[in-house]
């Protein structure tokens, strides 16, 4: 059985990482031998560099790679089964996304630099919000289990073979923002399908749209010319 390998970057050391939402998740499923973790602790470089290192390492050790932020807690006892079923017919899986993004969107859910939300009818999936300890609210976007064009990078999963067979990698010019949208565009260019699965999770964070985000958004728009 091919392993499920959770790939995560964190600024925490290994001991403190265990107390993060993702650290708690990994411990919660530690009894399942086919679920592994590849951790980049005390990390000071961009996510894409580390994610690409994980993809490269999987050439000789194939896996179902799950790229997850350290502030995400998976609260679904059957998430690995849902994920496997979703990847039977699709190539990239997430928890929230957009079926019909407008040209020039700066996020899967945002249309411009000012944070204007796109048409909710094109959204898919559901992610809960938390404060680091408790669930505080639900972001109910729309029904999951549907194909989309863009997904949120808080959780992205694909088989390592898909990356290798299609010469796909994360673009390292995107260190933290917009790498998710960029990867989705790459998958679409290759004719590969993207899917939002019904996996329950809590995101213990709030999104920020500061100067670094806007600079990254402009790089993304320049690369994809308004797609």
Placement of each model-derived feature along the sequence:
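Short, acidic/glycine-rich phosphate-metal binding loop used to engage nucleotide
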Residues: 40-47, 73
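Glycine-rich, basic loop-to-helix element that forms the pyrophosphate-binding segment
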Residues: 44-58
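Conserved donor NDP-sugar-binding/catalytic core segment of glycosyltransferases
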Residues: 73, 77-121
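A recurrent flexible, glycine/aromatic-enriched loop bordering the glycosyltransferase active site
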Residues: 122-158
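C-terminal catalytic/acceptor-binding lobe
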Residues: 150, 170-227
